[in-house]
Every structure is written in C-alpha cells, then in structure tokens.
C-alpha cells in the first residue's frame, strides 16, 4: 500500500486503486478546467495521462490555471503540466502533446487507446469532432461546457447534455451534436446566468470578446470532471466522498 494514495484507498478500496493505476486518461485543453482535472487525476492515482494543448502559459492565465506561474510564463502548457504531474506521481506515464486537437490531427491523437477522455476544449468544431469520434469508438468521455463569466462554483453539476439550459455554449453544443446524431452526452454544466464582464483587454484574433474568470469556477468544473472519471474507472460511483 502506497502512503501517497492511502487516503483514497480508504474510501475506494485496493482493487479500485489498482484499476486506476492500469488506466490511461486523455485530457484535452489544459486551461482553467483541464489543468485542474489533470492534477486531480494524477493525485488520484491514474497510471497514464495524455495531455494535449497547443498553447503556452501567459500571465493572464495565473488567476485560474494550476500550470500558470510566473516561472512558467511562455512555456508550453502540456509540458508544464507533464512536469507537474510527474512531480506529484513519479511513477505516472505521461504523453505531452503541444498541438491542437482537430479533424486534421484526429488519427494522430487516436493512435493510443484511452480508457477515458476529458474534453476541456473551447473551440466548438474541435469539441464536436472529439465527442463524435469518442462515441463512435466507444470511449467514455465527459465534456466541460461554459465556465467563463460565472461566479458561483456551487451551481456546477454533472448531467446529460439534454438536461442543460440557460448556457449559450451548451445550446450550441446541443445543436451541433444533434446534427451529428448524438442526443445524449455527459457534461459538466452550470445554469448560472453569465455576468457581463468589463472590457479591459482586446480579444485575440477570431474571438469577439474575452470572458472574465474567477479562480474557483473553472477549477470546480475540472474537479467534477475528475470525480466522474475516477469513480467511473473504479466502478465506485456510490463511494462516500
């Protein structure tokens, strides 16, 4: 018994922890949601992680992303998170990919077998392609919906996308997935109405605005994703945590 995972084993059991150690999970998008999801998966004892993000750490990420420190500004998020999870669990197998998941890179990404996928991608087209491919291949997947311009972390819930309402991003995703023949899909979602942020910076190319974000909001969504993944992999959804 490893002392590092002792507290988890007390609730989940040794067989469940062994299943986690044999599991590979992919986390796509390592921002405010995905970085915390990856961190929790590593701390829970998942044996292998594939970490995917094309971006580098910027100063504006520091308020909400666990990969973002002054010492990591300018470094690839995938590499920073890979180093972080190796420090958490030296025995973990990590595949860090500094690239964008999209239709053009799909086959390269799926050259590995995954037990679960955490979809923390922001771009609709890339997100839809990933979800459709995972469903077609029978790979369990959970997706994060909108976390920007929200303040109440307690409103987040795990649910089927068909049960979402009041979230513009969820509405777009429901429409796009319906068009692809998918009506049921696991998501982390908040019905909290979006706040209107003060425009303090210019949006990057291709975006109409920059959403505001608070430290605890995307982190809570990422931790809920990790909860679902770990408990599903352990087949221990009824664990008291």
Q: Where are the language model's segments positioned?
A:
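Conserved SAM/SAH-binding loop
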Residues: 97-106
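N-terminal charged helix/coil linker that caps or initiates catalytic domains
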Residues: 1-26
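Glycine-rich phosphate/adenylate-binding loop
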Residues: 110-113, 124-126, 136, 141, ...
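Hydrophobic/small residue at the entry helix of a nucleotide-binding pocket
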Residues: 33
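Conserved S-adenosyl-L-methionine
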Residues: 43-48, 136
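Glycine-rich phosphate-binding loop and adjoining beta1-alpha1-beta2 segment
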Residues: 46-89
């Amino acid at each position: 018994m490893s002392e590092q995972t002792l507290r988890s084993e007390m609730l989940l059991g040794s067989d469940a922890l062994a299943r986690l150690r044999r599991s590979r999970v992919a986390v796509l998008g390592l921002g405010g949601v995905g970085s915390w999801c990856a961190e929790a998966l590593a701390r829970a004892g998942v044996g292998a992680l594939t970490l995917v993000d094309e971006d580098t750490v910027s100063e504006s990420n520091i308020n909400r992303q666990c990969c973002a420190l002054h010492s990591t500004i300018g470094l690839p998020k995938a590499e920073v998170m890979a180093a972080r999870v190796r420090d958490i669990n030296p025995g973990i197998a990590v595949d860090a990919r500094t690239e964008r998941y999209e239709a053009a890179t799909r086959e390269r990404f799926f050259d590995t077998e995954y037990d679960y996928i955490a979809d923390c991608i922001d771009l609709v087209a890339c997100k839809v392609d990933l979800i459709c491919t995972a469903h077609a291949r029978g790979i369990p997947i959970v997706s994060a919906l909108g976390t920007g311009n929200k303040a109440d972390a307690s409103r987040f819930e795990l649910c089927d996308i068909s049960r979402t309402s009041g979230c513009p991003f969820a509405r777009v995703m429901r429409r796009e997935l319906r068009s692809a023949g998918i009506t049921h899909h696991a998501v982390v979602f908040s019905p909290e109405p979006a706040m209107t942020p003060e425009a303090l910076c210019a949006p990057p190319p291709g975006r109409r605005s920059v959403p505001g974000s608070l430290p605890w909001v995307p982190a809570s969504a990422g931790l809920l994703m990790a909860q679902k993944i770990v408990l599903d992999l352990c087949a221990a959804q009824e664990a008291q945590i």
